[in-house]
Regions:
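Short hydrophobic/aromatic-enriched beta-strand-loop microsegments
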Residues: 11-14, 35-37
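C-terminal substrate-binding/catalytic lobe of Rossmann-fold NAD(P)-dependent dehydrogenases
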Residues: 19-189
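Single conserved hydrophobic/aromatic residue that forms the stacking wall/gate
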Residues: 1-13
Length: 189
Protein backbone atom coordinates (compact mmCIF):
# COMPACT_ATOMS: atom_id res chain seq x y z
CA UNK A 1 0.00 0.00 0.00
CA UNK A 2 1.17 3.53 -0.77
CA UNK A 3 2.74 5.16 2.33
CA UNK A 4 0.68 8.32 1.79
CA UNK A 5 -2.55 6.34 2.00
CA UNK A 6 -1.44 4.42 5.09
CA UNK A 7 -0.64 7.71 6.85
CA UNK A 8 -4.14 9.05 6.12
CA UNK A 9 -2.83 11.62 3.65
CA UNK A 10 -4.52 10.14 0.61
CA UNK A 11 -7.76 11.94 1.39
CA UNK A 12 -6.19 15.36 0.83
CA UNK A 13 -7.56 15.59 -2.70
CA UNK A 14 -11.18 16.08 -1.64
CA UNK A 15 -10.82 18.19 1.47
CA UNK A 16 -10.32 21.52 -0.28
CA UNK A 17 -13.56 20.94 -2.18
CA UNK A 18 -15.27 20.65 1.20
CA UNK A 19 -13.47 23.63 2.76
CA UNK A 20 -14.15 25.74 -0.35
CA UNK A 21 -17.86 24.89 -0.06
CA UNK A 22 -17.74 25.96 3.59
CA UNK A 23 -15.96 29.19 2.64
CA UNK A 24 -18.53 30.05 -0.03
CA UNK A 25 -21.37 29.26 2.37
CA UNK A 26 -19.96 31.48 5.12
CA UNK A 27 -19.26 34.37 2.73
CA UNK A 28 -22.82 34.05 1.41
CA UNK A 29 -24.20 34.07 4.96
CA UNK A 30 -22.07 37.09 5.88
CA UNK A 31 -23.21 39.07 2.84
CA UNK A 32 -26.75 37.66 2.78
CA UNK A 33 -26.46 36.38 -0.80
CA UNK A 34 -26.85 32.94 -2.36
CA UNK A 35 -23.54 31.13 -1.91
CA UNK A 36 -23.77 29.89 -5.52
CA UNK A 37 -22.97 33.49 -6.51
CA UNK A 38 -19.77 33.44 -4.43
CA UNK A 39 -16.53 32.52 -6.19
CA UNK A 40 -13.67 31.80 -3.79
CA UNK A 41 -11.18 29.01 -3.11
CA UNK A 42 -9.32 27.37 -0.26
CA UNK A 43 -5.99 26.23 -1.72
CA UNK A 44 -2.73 24.62 -0.61
CA UNK A 45 -2.28 21.79 1.84
CA UNK A 46 -5.34 20.81 3.87
CA UNK A 47 -4.56 21.92 7.41
CA UNK A 48 -2.68 24.70 9.10
CA UNK A 49 -0.95 25.89 5.92
CA UNK A 50 -4.09 26.05 3.75
CA UNK A 51 -5.15 29.50 2.66
CA UNK A 52 -8.18 31.35 1.42
CA UNK A 53 -7.42 33.10 -1.87
CA UNK A 54 -9.13 36.34 -0.80
CA UNK A 55 -7.53 38.50 -3.49
CA UNK A 56 -9.25 36.37 -6.14
CA UNK A 57 -12.64 36.09 -4.40
CA UNK A 58 -15.69 37.72 -5.94
CA UNK A 59 -19.47 37.72 -5.89
CA UNK A 60 -20.81 37.39 -9.44
CA UNK A 61 -17.73 39.11 -10.86
CA UNK A 62 -17.60 41.95 -8.29
CA UNK A 63 -14.42 41.91 -6.19
CA UNK A 64 -15.22 40.70 -2.70
CA UNK A 65 -14.08 43.87 -0.91
CA UNK A 66 -16.21 46.05 -3.21
CA UNK A 67 -19.23 43.78 -2.77
CA UNK A 68 -18.76 43.82 1.01
CA UNK A 69 -18.82 47.62 1.02
CA UNK A 70 -21.90 47.57 -1.18
CA UNK A 71 -23.56 45.45 1.53
CA UNK A 72 -22.36 47.73 4.35
CA UNK A 73 -19.37 45.70 5.56
CA UNK A 74 -16.16 47.72 5.88
CA UNK A 75 -13.88 45.70 8.19
CA UNK A 76 -12.56 43.34 5.54
CA UNK A 77 -9.54 41.83 7.29
CA UNK A 78 -11.44 41.21 10.50
CA UNK A 79 -14.32 39.52 8.64
CA UNK A 80 -11.98 37.50 6.42
CA UNK A 81 -10.01 36.28 9.45
CA UNK A 82 -13.20 35.27 11.27
CA UNK A 83 -14.63 33.42 8.25
CA UNK A 84 -11.30 31.70 7.51
CA UNK A 85 -10.91 30.52 11.11
CA UNK A 86 -14.46 29.19 11.07
CA UNK A 87 -13.73 27.24 7.86
CA UNK A 88 -10.45 25.90 9.23
CA UNK A 89 -11.95 24.85 12.57
CA UNK A 90 -15.33 23.59 11.34
CA UNK A 91 -14.17 19.99 11.01
CA UNK A 92 -13.00 19.97 14.64
CA UNK A 93 -16.37 21.29 15.80
CA UNK A 94 -18.24 18.67 13.76
CA UNK A 95 -16.01 15.90 15.15
CA UNK A 96 -16.72 17.11 18.70
CA UNK A 97 -20.48 16.88 18.08
CA UNK A 98 -20.75 13.88 15.74
CA UNK A 99 -17.41 12.09 16.22
CA UNK A 100 -16.75 12.23 12.44
CA UNK A 101 -17.00 14.40 9.33
CA UNK A 102 -17.96 11.69 6.86
CA UNK A 103 -21.14 13.33 5.48
CA UNK A 104 -19.33 16.45 4.31
CA UNK A 105 -16.47 14.39 2.92
CA UNK A 106 -18.94 12.11 1.14
CA UNK A 107 -20.57 15.13 -0.50
CA UNK A 108 -17.17 16.38 -1.67
CA UNK A 109 -16.31 12.97 -3.15
CA UNK A 110 -19.77 12.84 -4.77
CA UNK A 111 -19.16 16.24 -6.37
CA UNK A 112 -15.77 15.19 -7.76
CA UNK A 113 -17.24 11.93 -9.11
CA UNK A 114 -20.10 13.81 -10.78
CA UNK A 115 -17.60 16.05 -12.54
CA UNK A 116 -15.71 13.04 -13.85
CA UNK A 117 -18.69 10.84 -14.77
CA UNK A 118 -20.63 13.66 -16.43
CA UNK A 119 -17.52 15.28 -17.93
CA UNK A 120 -18.67 18.58 -16.42
CA UNK A 121 -15.42 20.50 -16.92
CA UNK A 122 -16.09 22.14 -13.55
CA UNK A 123 -13.42 24.08 -11.71
CA UNK A 124 -12.77 22.57 -8.29
CA UNK A 125 -9.88 22.97 -5.83
CA UNK A 126 -8.32 19.51 -6.04
CA UNK A 127 -4.80 18.28 -5.54
CA UNK A 128 -2.62 17.66 -8.55
CA UNK A 129 1.05 17.75 -9.49
CA UNK A 130 2.38 21.27 -9.98
CA UNK A 131 4.71 22.04 -12.87
CA UNK A 132 5.88 25.64 -12.56
CA UNK A 133 2.74 27.40 -11.30
CA UNK A 134 3.95 30.07 -8.84
CA UNK A 135 7.37 28.41 -9.00
CA UNK A 136 6.10 25.15 -7.50
CA UNK A 137 7.63 21.99 -8.96
CA UNK A 138 7.11 18.31 -8.22
CA UNK A 139 4.60 18.80 -5.44
CA UNK A 140 0.99 17.70 -5.28
CA UNK A 141 -1.05 20.55 -3.86
CA UNK A 142 -4.62 21.77 -4.05
CA UNK A 143 -5.31 24.42 -6.67
CA UNK A 144 -8.38 25.17 -8.78
CA UNK A 145 -8.44 22.74 -11.69
CA UNK A 146 -10.76 21.80 -14.52
CA UNK A 147 -12.20 18.39 -13.64
CA UNK A 148 -13.76 16.27 -16.36
CA UNK A 149 -13.85 12.71 -17.69
CA UNK A 150 -10.07 12.36 -17.41
CA UNK A 151 -9.92 13.72 -13.86
CA UNK A 152 -7.79 16.85 -13.54
CA UNK A 153 -7.55 18.18 -17.08
CA UNK A 154 -5.81 21.49 -16.37
CA UNK A 155 -4.75 23.52 -13.35
CA UNK A 156 -6.21 27.03 -13.34
CA UNK A 157 -3.48 29.49 -12.24
CA UNK A 158 -5.70 32.00 -10.43
CA UNK A 159 -4.29 35.41 -9.61
CA UNK A 160 -2.92 35.69 -6.08
CA UNK A 161 -1.39 38.66 -4.33
CA UNK A 162 2.24 38.45 -3.16
CA UNK A 163 1.36 37.43 0.40
CA UNK A 164 -0.89 34.62 -0.84
CA UNK A 165 1.81 33.43 -3.25
CA UNK A 166 4.28 33.26 -0.36
CA UNK A 167 1.77 31.37 1.80
CA UNK A 168 1.16 28.92 -1.05
CA UNK A 169 4.90 28.35 -1.50
CA UNK A 170 5.24 27.69 2.25
CA UNK A 171 2.39 25.21 2.02
CA UNK A 172 4.13 23.48 -0.90
CA UNK A 173 7.42 23.37 1.01
CA UNK A 174 5.66 21.80 4.00
CA UNK A 175 4.15 19.11 1.76
CA UNK A 176 7.51 18.40 0.11
CA UNK A 177 9.16 18.04 3.52
CA UNK A 178 6.38 15.71 4.68
CA UNK A 179 6.70 13.66 1.50
CA UNK A 180 10.47 13.36 2.00
CA UNK A 181 9.97 12.31 5.62
CA UNK A 182 7.43 9.62 4.66
CA UNK A 183 9.63 8.30 1.86
CA UNK A 184 12.61 8.15 4.23
CA UNK A 185 10.57 6.31 6.89
CA UNK A 186 9.43 3.73 4.34
CA UNK A 187 12.68 3.43 2.39
CA UNK A 188 11.20 4.80 -0.83
CA UNK A 189 13.46 6.68 -3.25
Amino acid sequence: RDPLWSRGLGDVYKRQVLDTARLKYLIGEHLKVDNRSVHAFIIGEHGDSELAAWSNANVSGVRLDAFCEMRGHYFHEESEDKIYEEVKNSAYEIIQRKQATYYGIAMAVKRICECIIRNEQSILPVSSMMHGIYGMEDVVISMPAIVGKDGVEAVVPIELDEEEQEQLKKSATLLKELNTMIKTEHGVK
